[in-house]
Amino acid sequence: MEEIKFNQIGVSFKGSGSYVPDQILTNEEISQKVDTSDEWIKSRTGISERRISRVEDNVADMGYKAALTAIEMANWDIKTIDLIVLATSTPHDLFGSAPSIQSKLGASNAVAFDLTAACSGFLFALITTSQFLKAGNFKRALVVGADQLSSFVDWNDRRSCILFGDGAGALAIEATNEFDNFIGFDMRTDGERGCFLNLPSKNNEDSIIDNIEFLSGGFSPIQMNGQEVYKFAVKEVPIILDKLFKKTNYSSDEVDWLILHQANQRILDSVGDRLKIPREKILSNLEKYGNTSAATIPLMIDEAIRNHSIKQNDIIATSGFGAGLSWGAALIKWG
């Protein structure tokens, strides 16, 4: 593309990190609990195994470990970080896990808060954080995606228990006056279809005193209409990415890598086919980790950087999609 002189605040990508628990749950092991098989799961999802957090672990622990490796890659002084945004739907504390990550890191100068948008969460957090940096309010930021959905799965429901795993990923991003590697984005929500994928509250009626009743808090396991979610993803994700390419004056041919939320291999392949992006440009680690919700995109980015697939100045098209229903896309240049 033609070079345009840059005279605004832009975003630079400085580092990545990830963490997955050491407990591995294979398809064969799941098939001992529910009526399924390794072949059935792999043929329909592409997943062979997933990671499950130990009892003593939580989202803040995983997010901290992922963030620390991103900071090390960026070679930052932790005290220079001034913003931490955690994308999660499963905080260890209902009031938020980002402050715990801030504390564990010792990033005492950073504002820290959670953002909840399910499997779109990391992308929405990355977009939000980039806009804070471009507005000139912050200089260095960590964007973390971490989820522990194993705690909210019905392990007797073969439709959902085969899909989800735990993990965390993080990106270290920085404001710069020299260029802007956050090229563009788009975001969408359709609450009318929210019933296709949700994790609803499960409330029990109780009373404080006579005539004053309340609902005690809790949550039901994940509920999903897999067929509707599949149809939603393979239709909406190519549309939003195509619109983003047009808006940013890029073509799919200029994309080095397509990194989608790792929900289902058939979704990844279908989206790539509709955009005419070759399979070799579609990155996937779904087979090893399953759907880690807000962690999938940064986990995949970090893996691809560390195995030298993603290189400096590579163009990455990425899209998150999931509960809400929500979906979005971003176009970035690594570095």
Curated annotation (Swiss-Prot):
GO CC annotations, alphabetized: cytoplasm
Alphabetic keyword roster: Acyltransferase, Cytoplasm, Fatty acid biosynthesis, Fatty acid metabolism, Lipid biosynthesis, Lipid metabolism, Multifunctional enzyme, Transferase
Reactions the enzyme catalyzes: malonyl-[ACP] + acetyl-CoA + H(+) = 3-oxobutanoyl-[ACP] + CO2 + CoA
Region (ACP-binding): 262-266
Coiled coil: none
MF terms (GO), sorted A to Z: 3-oxoacyl-[acyl-carrier-protein] synthase activity; beta-ketoacyl-acyl-carrier-protein synthase III activity
Membrane-crossing segments per the record: none
Database matches in CDD domains: KAS_III
Positions annotated as active site in the UniProt record: 119, 261, 291
GO BP term, example: fatty acid biosynthetic process
Pathway(s) the chain acts in: Lipid metabolism; fatty acid biosynthesis
Top-rank taxon: Bacteria
Entries under InterPro entries matching the protein: ACP_syn_III_C, ACP_syn_III_N, FabH, Thiolase-like
Domain notes: The last Arg residue of the ACP-binding site is essential for the weak association between ACP/AcpP and FabH.
Similarity section: Belongs to the thiolase-like superfamily. FabH family.
Oligomer and partners: Homodimer.
Role noted for this protein: Catalyzes the condensation reaction of fatty acid synthesis by the addition to an acyl acceptor of two carbons from malonyl-ACP. Catalyzes the first condensation reaction which initiates fatty acid synthesis and may therefore play a role in governing the total rate of fatty acid production. Possesses both acetoacetyl-ACP synthase and acetyl transacylase activities. Its substrate specificity determines the biosynthesis of branched-chain and/or straight-chain of fatty acids.
Protein name, per record: Beta-ketoacyl-[acyl-carrier-protein] synthase III
Origin species: Prochlorococcus marinus (strain MIT 9215)
